Swiss-Prot record:
Quaternary assembly: The complex is composed of two ATP-binding proteins (HmuV), two transmembrane proteins (HmuU) and a solute-binding protein (HmuT).
Keyword Metal-binding included in the entry's annotation: no
Alphabetical list of Gene3D superfamilies matching this protein: P-loop containing nucleotide triphosphate hydrolases
EC number(s) stated in the UniProt entry for this protein: 7.6.2.-
Gene: hmuV
Protein's job: Part of the ABC transporter complex HmuTUV involved in hemin import. Responsible for energy coupling to the transport system.
Pfam family name, one: ABC_tran
Lipid bilayer topology: Peripheral membrane protein
Protein name per Swiss-Prot or TrEMBL: Hemin import ATP-binding protein HmuV
Keywords, sorted A to Z: ATP-binding, Cell inner membrane, Cell membrane, Membrane, Nucleotide-binding, Translocase, Transport
Family the UniProt entry places it in: Belongs to the ABC transporter superfamily. Heme (hemin) importer (TC 3.A.1.14.5) family.
Record organism: Bordetella bronchiseptica (strain ATCC BAA-588 / NCTC 13252 / RB50)
InterPro entries: AAA+_ATPase, ABC_transporter-like_ATP-bd, ABC_transporter-like_CS, P-loop_NTPase
């Protein structure tokens, strides 16, 4: 069962944000969404998540139009990590991660506690479990929020049902080690757990290393879509980012690319 955007057009205040964009997120794949600032990446992710209604076009989860699903139904099928999660309450880290179980009231407290423990471990933040969320650094908060959506993903597991995870710039506050760990986890969720994962990143080389498919947006339109070798070309770097770049075979990772801006 795929999550598919078909010919999406979306505007805000009369200004076009997306124009005729089609994209498929399939089970078992990690799709990277790239583009310059203001290209429409977060808007496309929000539309795929069912959080924004397009002016025209549709988003389908299998045969179901996302517009026919309510918030609870959506939350039981896909998890979303926004670019800037808003949390104004002084909660403990475990409580924040436990919010991932909110769409599943049928879970008993013991099951929720196990979900939280598993998500904390998978996100590498078990050592933060007893801390207060507002006291954490920006990078620590980002990793805790990642644990929250991991808990949600684990809670939604049901035989025969594909789960989807959407991450909007999840590594923006992370150091290089934790960037790689988070993206490695995202790829494992796709390849090993069969999830469909969409991630917005600005680091082209991280996208080239971890993603199976890349979608490159430019001014609200899809400029390129396909495997990294087809998307990360000098011509695309010039047209989308306005930079001259060399695209080389990665010296230590077979089959991967390295993009070097001149």
């Amino acid at each position: 069962m795929t999550l598919q955007a078909r010919n999406l057009t979306l505007a805000r205040g009369g200004a076009p944000i997306l124009t005729d964009v089609s994209l498929t997120l399939a089970p078992g794949t990690l799709v990277g969404l790239l583009g310059a600032n203001g290209a429409g990446k977060s808007t496309l992710l929000a539309a795929l998540a069912g959080e924004l209604a397009p002016r025209s076009g549709q988003v389908f989860l299998g045969d179901a139009d996302l517009a026919t699903l309510n918030a609870r139904q959506l939350a039981r099928r896909r998890a979303v990590l926004p670019q800037k999660p808003s949390l104004s309450f002084d909660l403990g880290v475990s409580d924040v991660v436990g919010m991932g179980a909110y769409p599943f009231p049928e879970l008993d407290p013991a099951a929720v506690r196990q979900l939280v423990r598993d998500a904390l471990e998978q996100a590498g933040v078990t050592h933060l479990a007893q801390r207060r969320y507002p006291q954490l650094s920006g990078g620590e908060q980002q990793r805790v929020q990642f644990a929250r959506v991991l808990a949600q993903c684990h809670a939604m597991h049901a035989p025969g049902q594909t789960r989807y995870l959407m991450l909007d710039e999840p590594i923006s506050n992370l150091d290089p080690r934790h960037q790689m760990e988070l993206l490695a986890t995202a790829r494992a969720l796709a390849h090993e757990a069969g999830m469909g994962v969409l991630v917005i990143v600005h680091d082209i080389n991280q996208a080239a290393r971890w993603c199976d498919t890349l979608a490159l947006l430019a001014d609200g339109r899809l400029a390129a879509l396909g495997p990294p070798a087809d998307v990360l070309t000098p011509d695309h770097m010039r047209r989308v980012y306005g930079i001259e770049a060399d695209v080389l075979a990665h010296p230590t990772l077979p089959g991967r690319l390295l993009v070097l801006a001149r």
